[in-house]
Structure formats: C-alpha cells, structure tokens
C-alpha cells in the first residue's frame, strides 16, 4: 500500500482529481491541465491534480503546467499495474479527457471501468466509448464534449460542489457488476461463441 497523500505531499483536506493512463496527445491531458488552471484560486487551493502515467506527451504537459503557474499538480510517472487499484481507491474524482486525434478515439477505455469499480465520480469525453455505458450524466459522473475545456471545467466544479452524491457510485452495484472484468469476460466469450457458431 502506498499512501499517495504522504508520497506526493498532498494535504488531507484537498480533493484529489486524477488522470491515470498513458500520456499521449490523444489522451487530452493538456486539456485537463488547462481546465484545472481555469478553476478559481480558492477552489484550486482545495484540490490536487494527480497525473499518473508516462508517455510522449509528459514533457509537454509539464511545460504547460509551469507556463500556467500551477502548484497543485503532481506528475507521478509510470504506475506499477499492481498499484493501479491503490491509486483509484485514494482519488476523489477520475477524469478521462480523451480527444478525437487524427481520427482516433478510445473505443472502450478500460481505465474508466476501473474508476467505476472503485466508486469514483467519473468525468469522460464523448471520445470514450465506455462513457456512454458507464456514465449516468449527473448521477455518477459527467460525459462531456471532447476538447471542450469549459465543459470539462464545469464538470469538475459540479463534481467538487457535490451536485451529484459522492456515494452514488459506491451504491450503484448494478453498474459495477455489469462492467466488472468477470462480467465483461463472460459477455465477450458469449459473443465469440455466437460468431464461431
């Protein structure tokens, strides 16, 4: 177990807004940094943006963070797959800001499943296929337009102001069960068996 607050010096009163995944241009992490920068300073002081992962866009995101003079942003680097659950367990809000990039979108986005499994408020874009199945807008999170930084900022504010119940995801057993790895595996096998005959 790694205590993220201790490891990254995050005050106990701060809400942790997290992205976990590869840092690539199509993942939209720069949009998340920009949306975070647009929050009022009194709100930013009560939040910490944790960007967990590594990739070709890491230096661009760090540069953007410096340019916007953001203090409450932490880049963790690569996360051991065995520790992913630990990261999800300790964040308050998970953001998956994927963009349409050179015709690319995230057909499913398993990372969103993990956030749902851990009972987190989730914010994802319409470029993430699983967002249509996993997110009940205003109930357990928000699905926003890809690349729309103002919508992303508003969704973060709504999540922080508890316009949706913080316990909604924990209680939404139906979604958690429906999209668990076990259930998804069973449905995948059923589809393959139907195709193979």
Language-model features: where?
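Nucleotide-activated donor-binding/catalytic signature segment of Leloir-type glycosyltransferases, i.e.
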Residues: 59-83
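Conserved donor-binding/catalytic core segment of Leloir-type glycosyltransferases
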Residues: 11-27, 33-36, 50
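Short acidic alpha-helix that forms the nucleotide-activated donor recognition element
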Residues: 59, 80-91, 117, 136
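A charged, aromatic-enriched C-terminal amphipathic alpha-helix characteristic of glycosyltransferases
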Residues: 146, 151, 164-194
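Short hydrophobic beta-strand element within catalytic cores of glycosyltransferases
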Residues: 112, 116-117, 121-125
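A short helix/loop element that forms part of the nucleotide-sugar donor recognition site in Leloir-type
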Residues: 1-10
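Acidic donor-binding loop of glycosyltransferase active sites
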Residues: 89-107, 120
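Conserved acidic donor-binding segment of nucleotide-sugar-dependent glycosyltransferases
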Residues: 136-138, 142-149, 157-164
């Amino acid at each position: 177990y790694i205590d993220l607050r201790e490891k990254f010096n995050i005050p106990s009163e701060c809400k942790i807004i997290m992205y976990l995944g590869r840092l690539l241009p199509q993942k939209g992490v720069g949009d998340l940094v920009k949306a975070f920068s647009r929050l009022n300073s009194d709100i930013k002081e009560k939040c910490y943006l944790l960007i967990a992962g590594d990739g070709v866009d890491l230096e661009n995101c760090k540069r953007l963070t410096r340019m916007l003079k953001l203090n409450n942003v932490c880049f963790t680097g690569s996360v051991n797959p065995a520790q992913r659950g630990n990261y999800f367990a300790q964040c308050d809000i998970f953001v998956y800001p994927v963009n349409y990039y050179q015709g690319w979108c995230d057909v499913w986005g398993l990372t969103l499943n993990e956030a749902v499994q851990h009972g987190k408020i989730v914010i994802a874009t319409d470029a993430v296929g699983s967002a249509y199945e996993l997110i009940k807008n205003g109930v357990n999170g928000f699905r926003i337009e890809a690349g729309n930084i103002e919508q992303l900022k508003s969704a973060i504010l709504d999540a922080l102001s508890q316009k949706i119940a913080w316990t909604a995801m924990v209680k939404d057993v139906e979604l958690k069960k429906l999209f668990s790895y076990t259930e998804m595996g069973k449905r995948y096998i059923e589809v393959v068996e139907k195709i193979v005959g």
